[in-house]
Amino acid sequence: MKVTTRFAPSPTGYLHIGGVRTALFNYIFAKKHNGTFLVRIEDTDKERSKDQYIDAIMDGLNWIGLNPDNEPIKQSERFNVYKEEAFRLVDAGKAYEDEGAIRLKINKDGSTLVKDLVYGDIEFPNKELDDLVILRSDESPTYHFCNVIDDNYQNVSHIIRGEDHLPNTPKQIQIVNALGYKGFEYIHLPLVLGEDRKRLSKRHAATDLMSYKEEGYLPEAVLNMLAKLGWSNTTEDIFTVEELIKIFEVQDIQKAGAVFDICLLYTSDAADDWSS
């Protein structure tokens, strides 16, 4: 299997430190398997998506050294594709129109199995899934629908993202099956938490990646800090990206939430290691 991963941020704000951790894990997993790392801009939120945020996201990835192997595609430029796929499902009797929107029909019998390489097999009862809106009445696609279509279009093999997306996965598997796609491998990462074990926010520390650049931190230091958020297989403190690629294994990803510790940006021998 050719490994292809993707980092798919929404340009509704600056690049969050938790998102950079997701990008890093996608990058090193792809490179470990001689695969491809993609970036996709999920800008279907017309009101909140801004070009300035797209520029900031790409600048941040460039600064930290996680450059994609593609020219990022924008979902806002693919609305016709999503519309065509939605009506293909309607024509096949797998979706229906509802007050101007289009919903996917969900068989309420049985369950949907999510096979996750970190959290294991998880079954979600289908009776708990609503008939999903896949196209809104204004013909804009919903997140789940265009997400699946683009992952298939870009030949993504492994979806690596935060574990807050686990409840989304059975919905997306239903879409995958309805569209007749091959499907994907899933790797969900533990959430990045503050010291109070609540989801990391600005009250814990700076969450915007470029804030760390402005404060004078080295990108290598930030990468090392992020690598330790939810993954560990060694007592070593300092890694180059090449070393991370070599030693990274999915089975070393932890399930428990990863506590953000600003002190991980400081090590006694960091300057010597990175300047050598």
Ranges and model annotations:
Residues F37, G65-L66, N152-N155, L200-A206, ...:
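Short acidic (Asp/Glu) and glycine-rich catalytic loops that position anionic groups and cofactors
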Residues Q52, V81-E84, P167-K171, I187, ...:
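Generic recognition of stable, solvent-exposed alpha-helical segments in well-folded globular domains
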Residues M1-A101, N126-K127, N168-L179, A221:
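N-terminal Rossmann-like or analogous alpha/beta NTP/dinucleotide-binding catalytic cores
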Residues S211-L264, S268:
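A conserved active-site cap/scaffold subdomain adjacent to cofactor or substrate pockets
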Residues V39-R40, P72, E185-L189, I238:
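Beta-strand segments within the central parallel beta-sheet cores of soluble alpha/beta enzyme folds
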Residues Q75, R88-K202, D208, Y212, ...:
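Active-site cores that bind ATP or allylic diphosphates and position pyrophosphate for catalysis
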Residues S10, S49, S201, S275-S276:
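Short linear Ser/Thr-Pro motifs
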Residues Y266-S276:
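Single conserved hydrophobic/aromatic residue that forms the stacking wall/gate
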